[in-house]
């Protein structure tokens, strides 16, 4: 059926918007941490992991961490990290908090707590949407899911945005629809390249293709070699990825038309 009713009336777009919303909130967390406890970022692998969110939800700032009961702080970190954060790690963080140059700003601390709560809620919503997408795509037999690096969610977004491939007479027509036609890339300057891109084609499809291309270049030797070739020609990474995305579109178009699974020597 019409790409499973365009993945049930564009659940993929809804997911895209939710993920984008979450990304903005994560940027806000980074900004607030830079104000309240800037040293923390160097003490953890990422600000956006469960243990850090647990820490900042309970102790939203260096001053709160420095004055916290050490045993309670250690318990919070140990539980949230499933035992990976030991008492020595707790001590390291608390000592750093004690000498932090971070500001003590109650309003910012409250904003940090609320922002983390919003991210957690979005995580649940995105997970629910992804489960619905997975249920739909599990009933589809599109060959694009056989391409290394294309997961269910990104593949679903591509299929939903394209719809009926027979509406496109050629791969070039599909490239134009995605805003990836050769004329889009007249300038070698990355900024100009993006300025052209944003005005043309489906931004949802373009996003899906660019992100899919990045993963395909990681997992598929043929695409990886193609990306390296473009980079060796002096092209910026994002411009090289745009070339990989165009190659991916041609591959997807051919596969959908033939119904054949991915061949490594494409």
Give residue ranges: language-model regions:
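A detector of single, family-specific signature residues
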Residues: 1-4, 8-266
């Amino acid at each position: 059926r019409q790409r499973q009713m365009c993945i049930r009336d564009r659940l993929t777009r809804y997911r895209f918007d939710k993920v984008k919303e979450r990304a903005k909130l994560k940027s806000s967390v980074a900004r607030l941490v830079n104000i309240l406890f800037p040293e923390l970022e160097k003490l953890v692998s990422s600000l956006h992991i469960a243990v850090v969110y647990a820490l900042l939800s309970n102790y939203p700032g260096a001053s709160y961490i420095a004055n916290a009961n050490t045993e309670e702080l250690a318990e919070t970190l140990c539980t949230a990290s499933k035992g990976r954060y030991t008492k020595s790690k707790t001590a390291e963080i608390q000592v750093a908090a004690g000498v932090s140059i971070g500001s003590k700003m109650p309003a910012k601390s409250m904003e940090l707590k609320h922002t983390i709560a919003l991210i957690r809620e979005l995580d649940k919503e995105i997970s629910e949407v992804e489960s619905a997408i997975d249920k739909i795509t599990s009933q589809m037999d599109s060959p694009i899911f056989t391409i290394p690096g294309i997961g269910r969610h990104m593949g679903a977004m591509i299929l939903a945005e394209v719809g009926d491939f027979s509406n496109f007479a050629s791969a070039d027509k599909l490239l134009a629809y995605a805003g990836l036609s050769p004329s889009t890339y007249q300038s070698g300057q990355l900024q100009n390249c993006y300025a052209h891109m944003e005005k043309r084609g489906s931004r949802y499809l373009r996003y899906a293709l660019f992100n899919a291309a990045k993963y395909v270049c990681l997992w598929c030797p043929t695409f990886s070699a193609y990306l390296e070739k473009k980079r060796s020609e002096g092209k910026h990474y994002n411009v090289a990825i745009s070339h990989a995305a165009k190659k991916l579109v041609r591959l997807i178009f051919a596969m959908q038309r033939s119904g054949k699974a991915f061949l490594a020597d494409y």
